[in-house]
Amino acid sequence: MPALRVLLRVAAVLVFLAGLVLFVFPLRTADWFAWTVVPPMTAVFLGAAYWSSAVLEAAGARSAGWDRARLAVWPVLVFTTLTLGVTLLHLDRFHLGPEHPPLARTAAWAWLVVYAVVPVAMLAAAALQLRAARSPAGPRSRVAPGLPGGLRLLLGGVAAVLGAAGTVLLAVPARAAVLWPWELTPLTGRAVGAWLVGLGVSAALAGAAGAARTARPVAASALVFVLLQVLALLRHGDALGRSPAATAGLAAVLVAVGVAAVWLLVLGRARPPH
């Protein structure tokens, strides 16, 4: 799957760069990013998601087989497709015009090209890989024991919560934003929603994985996501004052994701029985 590996490597670099601006320089998005992200808590939240995605995509690019690579491919495809839709809905908010700083304008046009090309390229590469995987001559994965029932239940719950929250933010961002711990605009609400749905798909795929070793890239990415979100809250947690219940809900989800990630990593390190 050479084409898929190249695509995942390129995607990993791109999301790392996006995360660099958002997480490290959240106050400079008006000058350096494709669109102005406010408040800074939203920028660092999105930056953490981008950086954690870089971990998953890099692992997918190094995967020897489709069983592990698909755990990166499908979430990326879902997220980029949704984000393209969000971009087109809010195109007037992007720094595409000459009135914006040159770097921000370059970032906006690059964003538009990337999100127009990557979903199509990812779908084409995945289709080729699926065709090769169905070939009788292709290698077959060894059957491995499934995940513990408790872990599957936890991952399923995380997937359901993230997917539902993301879908609501995508569909009715203005109404759903009142239930979020900090202020969201329609654009930032939908941007967060696209990430939540993508993360939910990732959790669902991890829960359906045949073995913990297969799902380790998802676990590593999820743990990075949680740690970066904790750091983001330490830096900009003053933005969370408007809804204690929503803040508690976010904390509960982060704890659940962290527990699932550590559980998967511990199981993945264990030697399979002979």
List the predicted regions and their residue ranges.
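Hydrophobic alpha-helical membrane segments
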Residues: 75-88, 195-199, 218-234
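Surface-exposed interaction/gating patches
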Residues: 1-20, 131-209
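Core segments of alpha-helical transmembrane spans in multipass integral membrane proteins
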Residues: 41-58, 78, 187-207, 224
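C-terminal ends of transmembrane alpha-helices
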Residues: 20-27, 85-98, 162-178, 231-239
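Membrane-interface helix termini and inter-helical loops of multi-pass transporters
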Residues: 27-35, 94-103, 137-141, 174-183, ...
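An N-terminus-focused feature that recognizes amino-terminal "leader" regions
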Residues: 1-75, 87, 104, 179-181, ...
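Hydrophobic, ordered structural segments
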Residues: 52-135, 232, 242-270
